[in-house]
Amino acid sequence: MAQVCDMCGKGPQFGNNISHAHNVTKRRWNVNLRPVRAKVNGATKRMRVCTTCLRSGKLVKA
């Protein structure tokens, strides 16, 4: 399952782990997603929404 917010489409960011000895390995920062039941067009729908969208009040919880 993709780590993508159903409201805003925000996905993971990619970068590097850099150790003290400057060894570099790839890593990713996932989005903080929460399963939510929300009302969309009058119907209840299960969504995976990032906490930024939850706090902004963009959706109405069912």
Curated annotation (Swiss-Prot):
Coiled-coil parts of chain: none
Keywords of the record: Ribonucleoprotein, Ribosomal protein
Domain of life, source organism: Bacteria
PANTHER family: 50S RIBOSOMAL PROTEIN L28, LARGE RIBOSOMAL SUBUNIT PROTEIN BL28A
Organism: Koribacter versatilis (strain Ellin345)
Entry keyword annotation includes NAD: no
Official protein name in the record: Large ribosomal subunit protein bL28
Keyword field contains Ribonucleoprotein: yes
Cross-referenced InterPro entries: Bacterial_rp_bL28, Ribosomal_bL28, Ribosomal_bL28/bL31-like_sf, Ribosomal_bL28_bact-type, Ribosomal_bL28_sf
A single GO cellular-component term on record: ribosome
GO biological process: translation
A GO molecular-function annotation: structural constituent of ribosome
Gene expressing this chain: rpmB
Similarity-based family: Belongs to the bacterial ribosomal protein bL28 family.
